């Protein structure tokens, strides 16, 4: 392109035309009646003679055009980092996979370049872009979104190649620069099989679609947009400075699945390559020329691209910490300044007149540097780059403006300088900028990388403002608030890809949320919790400033709602689209423009009212809420609806919504050039995690593609809809324009698009919950209602419904693993199903903990299903009326539904499932597998299938009937109750089938022979062997009913005629073992009875107090085990008599004894006291006497004969005497034979109860044990000047002289008497006594017994005595 003509984009010709430089600033004077009245001069001739194909980018017609657009803008499936992307043709056939590299980031290409097409410049450094040298015509360009405008202030053309560098007025904050290949211009560097594995391009020239027959179809671009695709491996020419690809054959697989070729309209657009060595995408070229035969790129080399920036730097400033602060002075008239440190002076250059490019960049090194501004600095386009920590301050409120600040990684710059009105401080770089100025800073901030800490200081009047506005973009930056008053929160916005606002433990109140996309983050990373308050409000006129733009004759881009002025007609128009055509061609198109007349003030007022109207629409926030904070959402002005389609990650946070509506939803996938809509099929999932969502008179929707984890508390008429179809979309989504919400309805059509909820819901005070999609958790409802339509609802926590309804709608499926409790009747509608199970074991697949569910009743609709299995226990009556419902009890799979807990196994009585309640379902079926059903009232069924199960009818005082048309039973038990004239009855009317079934009979009074009671009635001719009489243990006997079969004219009947009763030795043994447990407690006390007197013989002293603690365990027959802790305290006194030392004393005792066996477990607590005397003769003989009384509190649980838990009291008396003689073998060694006799009195106990209708009793009378013991102890004493230690060991034999009472057991078969048995055992002990002072003694003894039916396994006895 020469200097006389420039390429201009023609909206009329839908392409570029050559336009004289003299026409660049065309203005139309005079009053225009309409756009059609304009005469276009010679430019029109150029348009007419223009040949479209010569300026085209052409793509494959077999693939959706949208795919090429999404590719170029990183939208749809082509998000940054995506891999293995499938490419489909228009018929849905897979035509290729982008699997050679992850998807690159194309955001470094321009989104808008004035009248030039997008994508013709590429940012490769924070302030520099590269393009083709022949690309001219616009100095304005934007990145990320078209609103983010930058101005070209300088450029550098290559002297021989078609490439140039352009400098921008500011550092770009919205996007990250593209990385430049380090390979550069090397012949063959980009050929197939080399280091670079994939080549992608994009551009915004005129677009064409080409079919396999070579036919071209133009695509109307409405202002230009980007497309992109794959390029084949490249060959080099011109000494490697140029690369080319034969891309004309776009149907050749060698060119990739998204092959396309470019022409002049895409000049300057970038070519990216994936460097397999460095594992990254790099910029390798810019388009210079092309045709259908191939494209040619100028290789982007680091040498050239770094050439111009080097010219834009003044000398690097190196701070010397020994020379004081750097003094910065500046002359705004000359645009020249200095930074000096003592005698060292560095020159700097700033804006000169209107020339921003005169401003040079400055680099700073030297750690902990200090800079003081003596003058306000206007550095033009020059920026500051810090490689070390610095403090920058002003002498007297001087300001700084320029291209921006770069802080390198690990660097912290303390910035104490304010900015100026209408200027933004641009900040990038991974390091930190700490803003610490004073007073009110009128400048704004745009940050795109690293960290900015806002710590502005107040002025003398207490006023402070870190910035007038803040924009966070590119997704790489974080702004941290040191306090809540650093900036007006409503002046914070998040631009392209957003960034993080860290509340830093502060409480912040927003009335506006300005977030462009999902990259916007509000977080708190401080250990102190923050509160984010949203009091969102509609705009008011004072908040709105309207910029009146001048209409560009050659067309252009804008944002819907922008106000334009057409001077030729003195008319104001509001733009309704994102672009407009040239030469006033579409001013009459009401889809593009709204004519608002000739009055400027009125036009501005209309714009304001439109913006206010849009802001009153339901609110949306596309961003993220993260960290340690609560969110409080107040009633919102306008329409009180807030939709979050970003994400929430507040594991310890509470979100509160008062009135209005809150919606969590997924996000519709953004496609290039398309407005998102509720009706589109592709949505992105979003995660919402919080501790709790609290609703007060509010409505909450969890809509499609939203996954929520956290509890919900809903009160005061709140409504919760989990799986809602209500959604909102933003018609400006992906454009950077203000949110404009649109309400819609969208139902997920795949499981992956459905909502998922995990948590517990609390409903109070007339609130409601609708579970429509995936639910895992629990529900507590009080005076509220719950309905389920989901086919995947799981209660893994308790479901409790107090004065509340639970309704399963048509087709719903609910599984409750932790029980359901309600005082209302549950309703299960047509084709709905409810499954009740136990709690699955985490570590043992197939194992469950039993869980009980209790309801007032369950009503089943047509073809509804109720299943109780895998340790599920249901207590409820069930009605199905005339519905053909199905009830499944138990599970036949032997590998699941088990429990390894004996307690739980007893609850379930060994079955997989239990139902307690009657069923009224004349048209319904019940299937039982390894299940127990107890119908205590009448039940009626169409069909009953039972396998390895048990059916129990009736309850004491009430006989029940089970009426069933068809009964198919195998290996099952039917238990009925009977007296001598009546019984529960099973009535089979149509069909009886099965085998190996057992009839058990519980009786309500003493069984009598000669009865004649019908138990089962079946159709005539039924197999008499279907049932047989079974034996069951009742009380202490095995009872077998006598049943005969009778055939009548109409039926076969099983008739009860009597019983056979045989004593059950095992049951009797269990009972007597329990009754005998009192003796074992008595024996424990006996063994501890005379310990104190034995101590006296080893440590004679005067009067004193003592304490003793003993702990031991014992075991006996039938699995009996006990462990006890015994405590004694007492005092005694020595009386010296003639030839004898007599000790007398008193003691108090407490024993905590835990005992268990295979059939019982419990605790006995004993409290008592006694007196004792011990006489020690000078000859060595001694005697011991003791008497003691104990009161016992007993509580035991017995799992035999339905006895259950029993609490009772008892008491015992002890009288003991021991004599012995201590023979001294030497002065310190002795042997002591001894003999002891203990007589006692133990109170009896009595129990009366019923087991399966049988009256039982179990009692023993008071009895009087007499226990003897003989033995011998040996001991030796060791002593020093102030201490004495005595050690001893003993061996003895303990035996019963009298039998231990009598136990009487009584059941329907009569009384059974069991005499107590004598027992004996060997005793062994070792011990020691230590005298550490004249008045203190310590003792320790270990004891064990053997060879008895009951033995002490181990016992340890520790004592302490203090002499007065």
From Swiss-Prot:
Pfam families on file: Autotransporter, Beta-sol_PIC_HAP1_IgA0_2nd, Peptidase_S6
Record: active site: 134, 162, 267
Coiled coil: none
Gene Ontology CC, one term: extracellular region
Enzyme nomenclature, EC number: 3.4.21.-
GO terms classed as biological process: proteolysis
Reported modifications of this chain: Cleaved to release the mature protein from the outer membrane.
Domain Autotransporter: 1098-1364
Cited PROSITE patterns: AUTOTRANSPORTER, PEPTIDASE_S6
Membrane-crossing segments per the record: none
Peptidase S6 domain ranges (all copies): 57-307
UniProt cross-references to PANTHER family, sorted A to Z: ADHESION AND PENETRATION PROTEIN AUTOTRANSPORTER, AUTOTRANSPORTER
Domains (record comment): The signal peptide, cleaved at the inner membrane, guides the autotransporter protein to the periplasmic space. Then, insertion of the C-terminal translocator domain in the outer membrane forms a hydrophilic pore for the translocation of the passenger domain to the bacterial cell surface, with subsequent cleavage.
Protein name in the entry: Serine protease EatA
The organism of origin for this protein: Escherichia coli O78:H11 (strain H10407 / ETEC)
